[in-house]
Amino acid sequence: MNEQGKAINSSAESRIQLESSWKAHVGNWLLRPEMRDLSSFLRARKVAGVSVYPPGSQIFAAFEATPFQRVKAVILGQDPYHGQGQAHGLCFSVRPGMPLPPSLLNIYKELEEDLGLLRPDHGCLLPWAKRGVLLLNAVLTVEDGRAGAHQGKGWEGFTDHVVDTLNREREGLVFMLWGSYAQAKGKAIDTRRHLVLKAPHPSPLSAHRGFLGCRHFSLCNQYLSQHGLGMVDWSLPPCIALDGAILNGRIAV
């Protein structure tokens, strides 16, 4: 690469709003041509007046909340919630004050059945992320009212690379794969190095087929304890007790 090309890449890399430890491990992927095409697509949609979620500053919130070396468990989602004010960059999570989506209600039901933790009065899973649970969607953006609108636009290659990097460079992680989409995305995870937990999606359409009763939260902690990473505190504080300094920052709301 000539000096001009190096300078362009250096300038582009400096603009990537990715947490520093993740940038060191996967940031180069964002410099690929398909990611530049994705960036152009997102700009064009916004210029056309389309509402894209989550806000730009929160697209990489999962990485900001859970640095690379702090990851203990990974929950894979598909794409962000497509209602106004819901998505804030963490899969299955919604901002405080938003109604609880049906899938999240079922996650809370399983949490109570498995660990005896009562359902909180909000749907913000940021405390999990801060404790080492990477809440990663396969596709990091969506359009208002159009689920899956940004599938096939380039995000999947990046998030595949994220999963592959964790698979290769970390050991003793727990991957929680709920539904066929997440299971297909995690099919190459080395089960000799990590624990892979599979269950149907927590959607009301499938939760009764095996998600409810899967006991993934306790199984996760059992494995983490055995491998010296420390268990995840799956409890969630009431909305009034959520850390306001965090919630007012760019990684949450």
UniProtKB/Swiss-Prot annotation:
The record's subcellular location field reads: Cytoplasm
Entry superkingdom: Bacteria
* UniProt enzyme class: hydrolase
Q: Which reaction does it catalyse?
A: Hydrolyzes single-stranded DNA or mismatched double-stranded DNA and polynucleotides, releasing free uracil
InterPro entries linked: UDG_fam1, Ura-DNA_Glyclase_AS, Uracil-DNA_glycosylase-like, Uracil-DNA_glycosylase-like_sf
Query: Which cellular component terms (GO) are annotated to the entry?
Result: cytoplasm
Q: What GO biological process terms does the UniProt entry carry, in alphabetical order?
A: base-excision repair, AP site formation via deaminated base removal
Which coarse location class describes where this protein primarily resides?
cytoplasm
The free-text function statement in the UniProt record for this protein reads: Excises uracil residues from the DNA which can arise as a result of misincorporation of dUMP residues by DNA polymerase or due to deamination of cytosine.
Task: Supply the name of the protein.
Answer: Uracil-DNA glycosylase
Species assigned in the record: Xylella fastidiosa (strain Temecula1 / ATCC 700964)
Give me the gene this protein comes from. Answer: ung
